[in-house]
Design a protein with these regions (language model features):
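Short, polar/flexible loop-turn hinges at active-site or ligand-entry regions and domain interfaces
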Residues: 21-23, 150-151, 167-172, 190-193
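Amphipathic alpha-helical repeat scaffolds of TPR domains
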Residues: 45, 136-140, 174-187, 214-226, ...
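Short coil/turn linking the two alpha-helices of tandem helical-hairpin repeats
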Residues: 55, 144, 151, 183, ...
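Alpha-helical transmembrane segments and their interfaces in multipass membrane proteins
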Residues: 248-251
Length: 416
């Protein structure tokens, strides 16, 4: 170790070992000194963090500084950094009211960062405090969103539908947003939805408070998917096309695009609007990466991998699938690997595709993801058709199926 104007350690692990071996009062004293010598105006966030580490108990002043710093921390280190500041603010807050409000804010930040267990723990902390009706409805909404993003299983539609109904008299706009989340959850859950299938959610959404004039992007999308779920594709097509264009190309806030872009992508997919589907998903992947929102990034990366496979860019598809799998492992998320099934089938790897279909079907059933089961059923039929075509009399001897041309258009490179 060298001590001068800076303290230098021979290896970063030595620094960690020294820090962790120090007694708690010594660490707190050092953090307090560092806070005192850190400029309040030039680096308020670092100062707040050192003050928090130096605190021996609740401190409302430090908690308020951490809360103010959370937004700046997000800009530098992503949503996980913002969640860390807010969680520490909760720990330093003694008054029940402010503690509950900060816990709810920290829970939503943790949800967006993909820390689902932490989000639920913080929601429980918030629920134990004196919340008003809107805050309690938002706790229910958070639980539904965790169920959607963590597993997309059968529990999520009912939770989100209940939250939407609770929100109607409290916040009409948020209620409409929640109906859109519930519709997405119902599509994923399919036949495994405990309650709140696509038609039920669509009917409830059509009776929700009307959209403002002019409507927000999510209002256009909700009206389109609600008609899709009740009256069918032909009736919904004009509204879904308009919504898809707005989400793919329009002026839309990053938060809005990430939250409801998946539903817009489903609408474009239902209409086989591949151009809007690709543009929309690519835009959301880029936004989620920049914002560090791992929960949403995992879904969009897998979707982009599927599109890349359909468009013939198998290398990009494989890279995107690997990235999505890594995110899923890091966040503890279980989502059926649709993209891997599509890639194996389009490569002509019949044995691999069949094995994946069986594994994905089993996992999708266990997770309550009806969309995954339905998707695999369609892939199994497609594989049977491809197998019959590739083993018939028209197949050229010695030419592997994976190298025969397909009718899938190549629409350009996909970022990995």
């Amino acid at each position: 170790m060298e001590i001068g104007t800076l303290v230098r350690f021979r290896h970063p692990l030595v620094r960690s070992a020294v820090y962790r071996s120090a007694a708690l009062p010594d660490r707190q004293a050092v953090h307090l000194v560092l806070a005192e010598v850190t400029d309040r105006d030039l680096d308020p966030d670092r100062r707040a963090w050192h003050l928090a580490a130096a605190a021996a108990g609740p401190d409302e002043g430090v908690a308020a500084e951490l809360e103010r710093s959370a937004g700046r921390a997000q800009a530098r280190g992503g949503m996980a950094a913002a969640a860390a500041f807010l969680q520490r603010a909760v720990a330093l807050t003694a008054e029940p009211g402010p503690r509950a409000g900060r816990a709810l804010a920290a829970a939503y930040a943790s949800l967006q960062a993909g820390a689902f267990d932490a989000a639920l723990e913080l929601a429980a902390t918030a629920e134990a405090g004196p919340l008003d009706d809107l805050q309690r409805a938002r706790v229910g909404l958070l639980r539904g969103q965790v169920a959607l993003f963590a597993s997309a299983g059968g529990e999520a539609p009912a939770l989100l539908l209940q939250a939407a109904r609770q929100l109607e008299p409290l916040d009409g706009g948020l209620a409409r947003q929640t109906y859109l989340d519930a519709w997405t959850a119902a599509v994923f859950a399919g036949q495994f939805a405990h309650a709140g299938n696509v038609r039920e959610v669509s009917l409830a959404a059509r009776s929700a408070p009307p959209a403002p004039d002019p409507p927000a992007p999510y209002d256009l999308l909700l009206d389109g998917v609600a008609v899709l779920g009740t009256d069918g594709r032909a009736a919904a097509a004009p509204m879904l096309c308009r919504a898809a264009r707005v989400f793919a190309e329009g002026e839309i806030a990053v938060e809005e695009g990430l939250r409801w872009g998946w539903a817009a992508a489903l609408g474009a997919c239902v209409l086989w609007d591949v151009e809007s589907w690709q543009s929309l998903v690519l835009r959301q992947v880029q936004s989620a990466r920049e914002a560090g929102l791992l929960g949403q990034l995992m879904l969009y990366v897998h979707a982009l991998g599927t599109i890349a496979a359909w468009c013939g860019d198998f290398a990009a598809a494989a890279s995107l699938i690997a990235e999505g799998d890594a995110i899923a492992e890091a966040t503890g998320t279980r989502v059926a690997p649709f993209a891997a099934v599509v890639l194996a089938g389009l490569r002509g790897s019949e044995a691999e595709a069949t094995q994946l279909i069986e594994a994905v079907t089993k996992d999708a059933r266990a997770a309550g993801q009806g969309l995954g089961v339905q998707f695999c059923h369609g892939c199994r039929q497609s594989c049977a058709t491809v197998s019959a075509a590739t083993t018939g009399p028209c197949r050229r001897p010695g030419r592997p199926a994976s190298r025969r041309p397909t009718c899938i258009p190549r629409r350009g490179r996909f970022p990995s």
